[in-house]
């Protein structure tokens, strides 16, 4: 349903499917993503953000994760994927903000399961070390990702 919120936006994010705004949500007291097309009748408030609402305090935004993507192990011709993605060796090294890593992995169709179990055609890449997503809140969006068992 509809809710009213006061947010403190600081970044626009293109997920490849839609635009989001990254903002501090005063209602919940944390940083979140908001789909721009779902925001109705926005109003600009004449207020300065409080210190804890600034982007530098968003751990998921300031954290950079190093992702190592490799051709999916099920592929008979991994060299084609290496060529398609311009891999200089056996992997493609990417850096992403933790806040958007899940969106990126979803958009790129990266199998993030620990045992590369997603075998459908769209999954041409596999995340070589799914533990790199530990503590990344957006990892829930990454195809096949499973949080480590305690």
PLM regions with names:
Residues 1-88, 148-150:
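Core beta-strand-centered patch of the WYL/Sm-like small regulatory domain
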Residues 60-150:
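Polybasic (Lys/Arg-rich)
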